[in-house]
């Protein structure tokens, strides 16, 4: 699953609790959001370019498993979250409702990709 929203959303969500002056400030806010919604946050910046036409990329999960990516920089001041199937599977219960509540109040929210699979055994 992938979704994006405008970076100004963090000003409304966190207000003065979070300094939002540098890219790293926005990434800290993105990690806080991921922790609140999914139960895991960002653990390191990815090497190389950001991908998806963004300037930079950060990884969610751990050294052993990738739960998703957060892309930031460029793209009309938006931030893009990409969750892997593993990330969706390990997210804390109720993440769908928490994400819906967040996106409902976000600035310029957009669900950019949803993958659905059905296993037949």
Residue ranges and their predicted role:
Residues 1-121:
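Structured, helix-rich domain cores that form ligand/interaction pockets
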